[in-house]
Amino acid sequence: MSKFEIREVDGPNNVGLFALEDISKYTIIIRETPFYSFGMENIRHYMMNANPTGNPVLDAEIRELQTKIGVANKKYKQRDSSFNERYPSEARILLDRMAAIISEKDFESESKDVQEKWLALHDAHQDVRKDTLIGIFGLTSEKGKLFNGKIAYCRGFDKSKERYVVECNPNPEKVLLKKENLKTVSGVFRSNSYTEGLFETRCRMNHSCKPNTETLSVPQYNELYEKTLVANLPNECITIAKEDIKAGEELTAYYISIGAGKNVSIRREELREKYRFECQCEYCCNEEI
């Protein structure tokens, strides 16, 4: 029986996980395998092949991004480590664009089930641009409801109507939609991806700067807690309680890098940059006082 449930909440993610019962410290709450893995083999394919996407324009952009990322990394390594513990912003922007290209290409080859799970997650960025791969949701009119859940491409922006021109697959019909009804495939990936990939349940946990859970790979868990847990599938991760959790309490995760944990302003800056929200967790609010 599940120890938690998913509820709608006010906030950037719109949903959250809540304990259905008292959960003791160190209890395993979730065991989950990513429905989409962004592993090293995947990265090598795009980094090492001359034409990884088969699209000359995208392949040229990938090669250019690789060069620029290398330059940014060299600049960062030459700095005093006390200058900035986080990844340089100029490199992060380039990596985000690289992730957008790769995630969209991978999405197109995934099963319908994986695509539906992908687009069910939150998009904090909604960086809708021409030829961006998107999902449609939240339409309430009788005609609009027929488009909910469809995968489409943005073909431009109609300034007179203040709507995006959207072309649905496989039907070439074009419709005009508001930004609030669009999710970008790459934006969902950037908003939810962990090292192991995208998770259907784990990605619905909201952030706290003092979270009550932590997620580990099975080998990490066994080493840290001297256990002999056997993974059900490769890349399986487990989420455990870091403290005693009361029934009805929200389960929270830590979204940002360890180096950002020094003070509230640094944490909030990284959360704004990566996830587009202002953290109002209890830990941050107490630190402001």
Question: Where in this protein do the model-derived segments appear?
Answer:
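Conserved catalytic SET/PR domain of SAM-dependent protein methyltransferases, capturing the structural core
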Residues: M1-Y153, K161, C168-K174, K179-I289
